[in-house]
Amino acid sequence: PETEENRSFVRRLLLRLTETTDVVLLNPGLHLDDHWDLTPDVNRRVHSIERLVTPRNNLGVQTRVISGASAFIGNYGGLSYLAPMCGVRSLAFYSNPDGFSVHHLELAHRVFSKLKRGSFLALDVQALDMVGLVAGGLPLLSPELAGVDEA
């Protein structure tokens, strides 16, 4: 959902990712459904597909970008499912587990674990501090680590 916490999380994630790689935002710049497009204030190494997208070719352009990517990192949903089908690793985040069918998530894990290429992992953003503990004792994407002043 569009919340201040989620916008802050995405900003910190973009800052972290763009330290080492270029990021292509899959925002179509079109309002076709109930999804909102992030307008990041992070510009370094962030690229947009908006100028390439029309209502007719939107999904085709997104599919081609994902197919050529080394990884998909984004919100949990349709595009996070598409990435493993294209042989691309997918890391998806969600913040409201009541906002979707857990059965679909469990099924996705079972189906995508059988693929020879690509992978799928979906994480609740609330679990990131625990993941960070296991990954070296530092909270992942904490405001301090990302150099972001949350005040």
Language-model segment annotations:
Residues 25-29, 74, 92-94:
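Short beta-strand/turn micro-motifs composed of small residues
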Residues 7-59:
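Catalytic donor nucleotide-activated moiety binding site of glycosyltransferases and closely related
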Residues 62:
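Acidic, amphipathic alpha-helical patches
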Residues 80-151:
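Nucleotide-sugar donor-binding patch of glycosyltransferase catalytic domains
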Residues 1-4:
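Secretory-pathway luminal glycosyltransferase catalytic domains
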Residues 67-73:
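Acidic donor-binding loop of glycosyltransferase active sites
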Residues 31, 78-79:
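Alpha-helix capping/helix-boundary segments
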Residues 20-21, 69, 87:
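Short, well-ordered alpha-helix to beta-strand connector turns
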